[in-house]
Curated annotation (Swiss-Prot):
<keyword id="KW-0472">Membrane</keyword>
<keyword id="KW-0408">Iron</keyword>
<keyword id="KW-0934">Plastid</keyword>
<dbReference type="GO" id="GO:0005506">
    <property type="term" value="F:iron ion binding"/>
</dbReference>
<keyword id="KW-1133">Transmembrane helix</keyword>
<keyword id="KW-0812">Transmembrane</keyword>
<dbReference type="GO" id="GO:0009772">
    <property type="term" value="P:photosynthetic electron transport in photosystem II"/>
</dbReference>
<keyword id="KW-0604">Photosystem II</keyword>
<dbReference type="GO" id="GO:0016491">
    <property type="term" value="F:oxidoreductase activity"/>
</dbReference>
<dbReference type="InterPro" id="IPR036854">
    <property type="entry name" value="Photo_II_D1/D2_sf"/>
</dbReference>
<dbReference type="GO" id="GO:0016168">
    <property type="term" value="F:chlorophyll binding"/>
</dbReference>
<feature type="binding site" description="axial binding residue">
    <location>
        <position position="196"/>
    </location>
    <ligand>
        <name>chlorophyll a PD2</name>
    </ligand>
</feature>
<keyword id="KW-0460">Magnesium</keyword>
<feature type="transmembrane region" description="Helical">
    <location>
        <begin position="151"/>
        <end position="164"/>
    </location>
</feature>
<dbReference type="InterPro" id="IPR005868">
    <property type="entry name" value="PSII_PsbD/D2"/>
</dbReference>
<keyword id="KW-0793">Thylakoid</keyword>
<feature type="binding site">
    <location>
        <position position="141"/>
    </location>
    <ligand>
        <name>pheophytin a</name>
    </ligand>
</feature>
Length: 351
């Protein structure tokens, strides 16, 4: 008889922590959860706190909290004052010096939410990578989620970094985001930017593809149930497919003359279109951060200036942009003491 004598391998601290993090529980934690849960919790908590109690009087001269009479659509956590520049506005930093009230007044909550929100989104993306690896599937969900991360980082961080201060980023609120959109249009003519056009095409195209795909699958289910919905006929363990790709292909071939014949290509296309839209719009925002111009049809502007009877939709929009700038610059940045001479104020029959 042979007796094998061996030592149990000692499990280090890393192995113990790894086992605990990956334990099967109702809400999976994982290594990504160390980044995701604290940052997401703090970002959400900061936003609820700011919209409930914190004023924007000292940064924008506005009321922005429920305490001041705002509602869900008008409440916001506003960006720091322009004088703060690109400071991280740490609570213990030279601006607030540990004073929480002063920190809120100068816009510290916005920097807090923006930075923790960015890390929270990155943590959620890493969570999808981690779970995909543990389950044994490919990480396309995480790759797709890179689109929202790119948009958040470009709009809330990179754009104001290219401008004078965090002041020019969007505030965290519904009406505040709308104001930021008007700002982008007035100061950058954003709607005529080709990267914005590609972004719109990607997002709306993705919504259209989603609707078409869902309707087509519902139309070609192999077996319909006798209940009020179609889920009764589906079982998670069935070996056959739920709907007929062949029938769907024939249907769209008759309508368009061409149709997807391969499920992999079809679903990759549905992944690619909206993600490409998000990424291209993010690239466009980085261009705006650097004050790059897109389409300026100067010849039309010159002709419209010389000929009062010549006007295009482009020249009308340029006049609208001038109006936005003349109002928003003085209204939003009173500390700059902007004074606009009469010749730059909106004019012409477009307004």
């Amino acid at each position: 008889m042979t007796i094998a004598i061996g030592q149990n391998q000692e499990r280090g601290l890393f192995d113990l922590v790894d086992d605990w993090l990956k334990r099967d529980r109702f809400v999976f934690v994982g290594w990504s959860g160390i980044l995701l849960f604290p940052t997401a919790y703090l970002a959400a908590g900061g936003w609820f706190t700011g919209t409930t109690f914190v004023t924007s009087w000292y940064t924008h001269g506005l009321a922005s909290s429920y305490l001041e009479g705002c509602n869900f659509l008008t409440a916001a956590v506003s960006t720091p004052a322009n004088s703060m520049g690109h400071s991280l506005l740490l609570l213990w930093g030279p601006e607030a010096q540990g004073d929480f009230t002063r920190w809120c007044q100068i816009g510290g909550l916005w920097a807090f939410i923006a930075l923790h929100g960015a890390f929270g989104l990155i943590g959620f993306c890493l969570r999808q990578f981690e779970i995909a690896r543990l389950v044994g599937i490919r990480p396309y969900n995480a790759i797709a989620f890179s689109g929202p991360i790119a948009v958040f980082v470009s709009v809330f961080l990179l754009y104001p970094l290219g401008q004078a201060s965090w002041f020019f980023a969007p505030s965290f609120g519904v009406a505040a985001i709308f104001r930021f959109l008007l700002f982008l249009q007035g100061f950058h003519n954003w709607t005529l930017n080709p990267f914005h056009m590609m972004g719109v095409a990607g997002i709306l195209g993705g919504a259209l593809l989603c609707a078409i795909h869902g309707a087509t699958v519902e139309n070609t289910l192999f077996e319909d149930g006798d209940a009020a919905n179609t889920f009764r006929a589906f079982t998670p363990t069935q070996s056959e497919e739920t709907y007929s790709m062949v029938t769907a292909n024939r249907f769209w071939s008759q309508i368009f003359g061409v149709a997807f014949s391969n499920k992999r290509w079809l679903h990759f296309f549905m992944l690619f279109v909206p993600v490409a839209g998000l990424w291209t719009s993010s690239i466009g925002i980085v261009g705006l951060a650097l004050n790059l111009r897109a389409y300026d049809f100067v010849s039309q502007e010159l002709r419209a200036a010389e000929d009062p009877e010549f006007e295009t939709f482009y020249t009308k929009n340029i006049l609208l942009n001038e109006g936005i700038r003349s109002w928003m610059a003085a209204q939003d940045q009173p500390h700059e003491n902007f004074v606009f001479p009469e010749e730059v104020l909106p004019r012409g029959n477009a307004l």
